[in-house]
């Protein structure tokens, strides 16, 4: 079996393998202003040139910097850093490892080296020893622990897929050539291509394209675009008010029945990332 999840979110474990503190979702506002605060020590142009990862306010590097500011005791007590799918794999197998495609989204992995960038980690003031060896998708982690095996009644080998769900989605596209353009749509829409080498030029940085790690050491060169998050949020809010959520076809029909909106909305604006009310 293999597990994939969204990217950027993580857990910290103590020396006994127990979670330290809360696991915080990436839409939390704790990273506000972190990039600007880090700019003197780590200019974003340098950060991008080394990692190839686009600016997003919720990048793992910024989450860890925010944690260092708010709860330095948690970071000091940490022995292990795991992304969300890494942690689930750890619970199943007892093996602590960081899978490459998800690790690449942290903005802590060198685009060329495909390994942890010690200089970036040092400039952020993070403990290097918490980061585990990076494992490539396709490798086997191992069998279930005895505890899991007894609980489920069978054994199973846990394999590493591209544990970033977009990496697995791109891998599933039945493209036959190197010029294919991919669009993976869900809460986010990810539009891009696969490249054999990262593109970390100043022009790429200015356009805020990202180079996420892919299967067989390839790079998913793409743009993050607002996906279904806005309509998902509106649907949830309407359901909370009415007691039952409208269907997506009902929402689309209601929107089509309205008069044209005279303005243009930039759906990529940060105010839509985690508003208290998407409707308002």
Feature roles, as predicted:
Residues 1-6, 137-138, 185-188:
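Glycine-rich beta-strand-to-loop/alpha-helix junction loops that act as flexible
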Residues 2-61:
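Active-site phosphate-binding/coordination module
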Residues 22, 77, 129-130:
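Short acidic capping loops at alpha-helix termini that bridge into adjacent secondary structure
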Residues 32, 39-51, 57, 62-95, ...:
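Active-site core segments that coordinate phosphate-bearing ligands/cofactors
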Residues 52-55, 104-109, 135-139:
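Conserved short loop/turn motifs at secondary-structure junctions
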Residues 94-102:
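Enzymes and membrane/adaptor proteins characterized by extended Gly/Ser/Thr/Asp/Glu-rich
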Residues 118, 124-139:
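A conserved helix-loop-beta module that forms one wall/lid of the active-site cleft
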Residues 142-143:
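Hydrophobic alpha-helical transmembrane segments
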């Amino acid at each position: 079996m293999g597990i994939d999840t969204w990217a950027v979110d993580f857990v910290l474990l103590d020396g006994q393998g127990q979670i330290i503190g809360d696991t915080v979702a990436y839409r939390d506002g704790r990273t506000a202003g972190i990039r600007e605060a880090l700019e003197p020590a780590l200019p974003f142009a340098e950060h991008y040139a080394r990692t190839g990862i686009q600016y997003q306010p919720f990048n793992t590097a910024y989450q860890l910097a925010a944690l260092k500011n708010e709860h330095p005791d948690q970071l000091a007590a940490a022995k292990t850093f795991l992304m969300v799918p890494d942690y689930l794999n750890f619970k199943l197998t007892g093996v602590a490892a960081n899978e490459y495609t998800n690790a690449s989204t942290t903005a802590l992995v060198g685009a060329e080296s495909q390994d942890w960038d010690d200089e970036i980690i040092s400039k952020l003031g993070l403990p290097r020893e918490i980061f585990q060896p990076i494992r490539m998708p396709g490798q086997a982690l191992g069998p279930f622990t005895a505890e899991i095996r007894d609980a489920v009644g069978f054994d199973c080998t846990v394999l590493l897929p591209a544990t970033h769900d977009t990496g697995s989605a791109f891998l599933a596209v039945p493209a036959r050539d190197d010029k294919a353009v991919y669009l993976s749509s869900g809460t986010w829409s990810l539009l891009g291509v696969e490249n054999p080498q990262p593109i970390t030029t100043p022009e790429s940085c200015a356009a805020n394209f990202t180079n996420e790690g892919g299967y067989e050491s390839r790079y998913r060169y793409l743009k993050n675009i607002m996906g279904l998050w806005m309509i998902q949020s509106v649907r949830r809010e309407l359901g909370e008010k009415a007691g039952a959520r409208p269907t997506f076809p009902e929402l689309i029909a209601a929107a089509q029945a309205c008069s044209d909106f005279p303005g243009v909305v930039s759906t990529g604006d940060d105010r839509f990332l985690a508003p208290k009310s998407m409707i308002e």
